[in-house]
Amino acid sequence: MQEKVGTAVLECGIGGEYDSTNVLVKPSATGVTSLGIDHTAMLGETIESIAWHKAGIFKEGVPAFTASQAPSALKVLHERAEERKTQLQEVPRYTALDQVKLGLHGDFQMINASVAIAVCASHLQKMGYSNLPDPQNKDTALPEEFVRGLEQVRLGGRCEIRPDNARKDMTWYIDGGHTLESIEMAGRWFATIAAQSSGDKQGTTRILIFNQQTRDAGSLARKLHDTLAAATGDSHPFKHAIFCTNTTYRDAGFKADLVSMNTNKDDVDTLKVQKELAGAWDGIDPEASVHVLSTIEEAIARARELAANDKTEVLVTGSLHLVGGVIEVLESQGSGSSTL
């Protein structure tokens, strides 16, 4: 209020029912994107429980929007909307997005973009603007200002592509997927990359850098492999799989803003999770060479060593802390910003 902000977009930290964003008792609109199983210690272990928490942002008389959800989750969202005396609208995927070069990679981002369009249109209508998209009409037209915003949007660490300045033929594909649903989306996205260069498979080295320190890491790794195998028809999607902790640098340790307070220090120091992942990947894909390393910096260096002079595609996924650390190290070493 002191800064006289005209429009603010606030994202919940975890959940919604008990989130600090509820300090705003009368927002102009609320939105829920695609739900997945995450933060189960606080939100519960079922999609219905998570939906209940997420719907905690709904406010009386304030328009509420949601992406398509599992039927059981959608039922909970509607029940919660009724409790809060508001109407919940399920947002369609807008056909006009097919003509937009969205600034974010990944087909699933079209769903997120649709929710953003609906929430934005509702907010702008309250501010007195006209000629806005109709949130309930999947064939609604998008004004030029909406198209420009969608094309210029950037989100680091989500379906992000970065060239490696140290090696001309090396490219980093970075996505912070860390739930079964989001890791599947990351796998599908990378599968499209693999398909584009499938004719040159013999000359392309594909490397995985993966970690997930606090969730069921083995299940996430298997989901990633199975998604890629199904999408590409190749049961050996990576020549090398590197498992490292989220520790940023070999000598300096964590960069301050990349520290996770939810990890077990002993597990990190002994590489417990990484060794378990290495064993799991040996069972998933015995043909891949598996590497266990202590830090992100060392994982990046190993990937460059393994690349030799081949065309190399490196997928980094499994953890937002891992992704943040990889971007930090790459940028500190002068590797390029993201490309479209």
Regions found by a protein language model. Name each.
Residues 1-68:
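Flexible active-site lid/hinge loop adjacent to a nucleotide/diphosphate
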Residues 3-6, 203, 309-311:
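Short, high-confidence coil segments that cap the C-terminus of an alpha-helix
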Residues 7-10, 20-31, 35-36, 49, ...:
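Nucleotide phosphate-binding/pyrophosphate-handling subdomain across enzymes
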Residues 38, 246-249, 336-340:
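Short, flexible loop segments at boundaries between secondary-structure elements
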Residues 62, 84-88, 113:
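Short glycine/serine/threonine/alanine-rich loop segments
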Residues 70-85, 89, 169-172, 225-313:
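C-terminal helical cap/extension that packs against the catalytic core
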Residues 319:
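Active-site-proximal loop/hinge segments that shape catalytic or ion-binding/gating pockets
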Residues 324-339:
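Active-site-adjacent alpha-helix immediately C-terminal to a catalytic or transition-state-stabilizing loop
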